[in-house]
Amino acid sequence: MSGGVYGGEELCALVFDVGHNSFRAGFAGEDCPKTDVPSLIGYIEEAIDSKTEQTDINANNVGSQQSQRRYIFDTPGIKSPRSNMELLTFLKDGMIDNWDLMEKMLDHIYAKHLNLESAHHPVLFSEAPWNSRSKREKLCELMFEKYNIPAFFLIKNAVLSAFANGRATGVVLDSGQNQTSAVPVHDGFVIQQAIVQSPLAGDFITNQCRQYFEEKNIKLVPYYMIASKEQVKESEPARWKERSNIPDNLTSSWKNYMVKEMLQDFKAAALQVGDSAFNKEIAESMPSIHYEFPNGYNMDLTSDRFLIPEALFDTSQIKGFNSTVMGMSQIVTASIGLCDVEIRTSLPGSVIVTGGNTLINGFTERLNRDLTTKTPASMRYKLIIPNSSIERRYSPWIGGSILASLV
């Protein structure tokens, strides 16, 4: 899959890794993807005449001359306020659900980011461990029939994460935007019947943050609304002026996305997972974090910044607690327990931690503590944690880059 030779030039294989947060694409053998594009796509239904020309470099046009759907890609494009722009993703539960949007995204990746002929490059494509046979066949058909690629390899992202960390056997704990999963891998193969999933992931924590601010009566004002702001003292009402040139008819999907981006910034800057089960007195004694919102409102956070992410590990902290929902350490131990006895002992020594949600401060330390204190001493757990945040976010892509360069 390394690419072969075309016209005297060696052509590298391409590696595609798709997640709910972003689509990573690049060349086999590289240390990181060439491009990291949001998995959300904007579109606008608009009427045009035959003389209209499209000048937006982040947009593609399809449809008739009388009416067409204009697509908008990439972070600058989808973050720009536009009238009637809806945001959609092509994924559901980690699997491709909207094939038309997926095709538009691939067109955009090839033309704007990779700038190459698809027919000249083999492709390694990651997939969710629970992906269905019909979806695998449809993706294979799309890549061969539309993009005319010379070779195609579809492989589960948990296996790639294991390879990226030098392991062929272990449990991959992947906590991303949409869900968290524990996937056991043995000699490079996923143990399907032992996959355990949990909805406690990035979007869950983002919603916990939103609920927290609603309870505190703190209004969330995204960047795009603000023309200017004044400095105010801690916890005083914000003094800011609204932009006068905000387009009309901004859609709910776009406004929700902009608020979500703001909450994700708060999450990365302020939240921390405690070393042990939440204790308000201990949390209050920890150093506070000062955080300022885009409109100038600012506050100090003490125990609350530990309480919000605590639900990832102690599900009793969730309001309306559902007893079937498992925390991070529980899904790891449950996954191992579902494996055959013959391979069970080989898994705890390689618990591979990956996914953007694991970058919350204190996440890996708490996971390690819970696994070592809440399980039998005979089960010696060892966390395999990539050295940098980039490696942790891009583990499946990096594993694919390594594998595709060797084949």
Locations of regions flagged by a protein language model:
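C-terminal region/appendage detector
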Residues: M1-V407
